[in-house]
């Protein structure tokens, strides 16, 4: 099962995970309430707020024995997150390779980074940023059209409850994904 290593504030869950990859285990989750230097693909800055119950800023550590479907991992994580967002009555769309949109606005982003020594994979760090409770005035700080579950539903989201659902969906599908890859668009 997973172990969650939580911080009030980090520069980045991804940076911490890279620095501590040796001691982190398969399925460990590094999380924080606020990132001071969160980033996505191409080092794009990820806006971080710890107001109103917060958002999701996590890195999931994976140390798979089978790397056959590694090229599908970001898409797999996005499908799992989309399935979780659907549980809140939202209709997610994908902007592949690594974004989820609601009504054309970004609600989540993912970044999978692997570390190899020669041909041996030391681990994969899957960074996830998901906007749970950002309000309209905070969304204006983001350099692209963005939204949050709260902005779409006008209901506050309990971060622990959301993460429990996300991890449940992930753990339910992950072993099959390692063996078979993504089968169709719908998981969960």
Predicted regions and their residues:
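N-terminal lobe of the biotin/lipoate ligase/transferase fold
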Residues: 1-87, 108, 115, 156-157
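Residue-level signal for inorganic ion chemistry
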Residues: 13, 58, 99, 129, ...
């Amino acid at each position: 099962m997973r172990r969650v290593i939580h911080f009030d504030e980090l520069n980045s869950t991804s940076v911490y995970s890279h620095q501590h990859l040796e001691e982190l285990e398969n399925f460990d989750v590094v999380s924080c309430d606020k990132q001071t230097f969160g980033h996505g693909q191409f080092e794009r800055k990820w806006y971080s707020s710890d107001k109103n119950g917060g958002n999701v800023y996590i890195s999931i550590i994976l140390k798979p024995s089978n790397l056959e479907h590694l090229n599908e991992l970001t898409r797999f994580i996005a499908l799992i997150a989309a399935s979780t967002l659907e549980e809140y009555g939202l209709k997610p769309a994908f902007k592949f390779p690594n974004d989820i949109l609601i009504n054309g606005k970004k609600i989540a982003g993912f970044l999978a980074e692997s570390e190899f020594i020669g041909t041996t994979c030391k681990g994969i760090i899957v960074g996830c940023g998901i906007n749970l409770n950002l309000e309209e005035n905070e969304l204006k700080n983001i350099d692209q059209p963005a939204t949050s579950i709260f902005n779409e539903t006008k209901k506050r989201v309990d971060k622990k409850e959301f993460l429990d659902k996300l991890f449940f969906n992930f753990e339910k599908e992950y072993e099959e994904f390692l063996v078979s890859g993504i089968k169709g668009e719908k998981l969960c």
